[in-house]
Curated annotation (Swiss-Prot):
Post-translational modification: The N-glycosyl content is primarily Man(9)GlcNAc, with a small amount of Man(8)GlcNAc.
UniProt protein name: Non-structural glycoprotein 4
Domain notes for this protein: Binds 1 calcium ion per tetramer.
Record topological domains on the Lumenal side: 1-28
Source organism per UniProt: Rotavirus A (strain RVA/Human/United Kingdom/A28/1987/G10P[X]) (RV-A)
Function text: Plays an essential role in the virus replication cycle by acting as a viroporin. Creates a pore in the host endoplasmic reticulum and as a consequence releases Ca(2+) in the cytoplasm of infected cell. In turn, high levels of cytoplasmic calcium trigger membrane trafficking and transport of viral ER-associated proteins to viroplasms, sites of viral genome replication and immature particle assembly. The secreted form acts as an enterotoxin that causes phospholipase C-dependent elevation of the intracellular calcium concentration in host intestinal mucosa cells. Increased concentration of intracellular calcium disrupts the cytoskeleton and the tight junctions, raising the paracellular permeability. Potentiates chloride ion secretion through a calcium ion-dependent signaling pathway, inducing age-dependent diarrhea.
Binding annotation for Ca(2+): 120, 123
InterPro entries linked to this entry: Rotavirus_NSP4
Coiled coil (residue ranges): none
Cytoplasmic compartment segments: 52-175
Residue spans crossing the bilayer: 29-51
Membership in a protein family: Belongs to the rotavirus NSP4 family.
Length: 175
């Protein structure tokens, strides 16, 4: 990592590039010189900033390929933004992350739909049971023993003596 923070070296290289360009292009009518110089300055700065950054990242990280890919994609996206483009380069990892997010959201919605469908089915079954209980059913004969609480009433033939002991008897009283 030689000359990583050597500002004088960077400034001297920029000055050398500018003086070289001035000597090559001495024509005073050159209208595009400032643009060419600024593009070269940006490229040189990117070169000086990205090489040491990538070296440090490669040494400290375990997955060097992803770091290099991320750095290159970031550099290209920066250049595209400088050029005025709104589009960006995306990596497969970003696309996979977005796909995973979309699939997760779809699963969540499917689960919600399943829960709602189950609830609706339960409500329909409950309404059917309520309707069945409210339905008027025609019967042949009405069993009134339930209504007058006389389920265990014995008939005359069932009594031992043949008479109903609860039936009132004629009683004569002396006056």
């Amino acid at each position: 990592m030689e000359k990583l923070t050597d500002l004088n070296y960077t400034l001297s290289v920029i000055t050398l590039m500018n003086s070289t360009l001035h000597t090559i292009l001495e024509d005073p009518g050159m209208a595009y010189f400032p643009y060419i110089a600024s593009v070269l300055t940006v490229l040189f700065t990117l070169h000086r900033a990205s090489i040491p950054t990538m070296k440090i990242a490669l040494k400290t990280s375990k997955c060097s390929y992803k770091v290099v890919k991320y750095c290159i994609v970031t550099i290209f996206n920066t250049l595209l933004k400088l050029a005025g483009y709104k589009e960006q380069i995306t990596t497969k990892d970003e696309i996979e992350k977005q796909m995973d997010r979309v699939v997760k959201e779809m699963r969540r919605q499917f689960e919600m739909i399943d829960k709602l469908t189950t609830r609706e089915i339960e409500q329909v079954e409950l309404l059917k049971r309520i309707y069945d209980k409210l339905m008027v059913r025609a019967t042949d004969g009405i069993d009134m023993t339930k209504e007058i609480n006389q389920k265990n009433v014995k008939t005359l033939e069932e009594w031992k003596s043949g008479k109903n002991p609860y039936e009132p008897k004629e009683v004569t009283a002396a006056m």
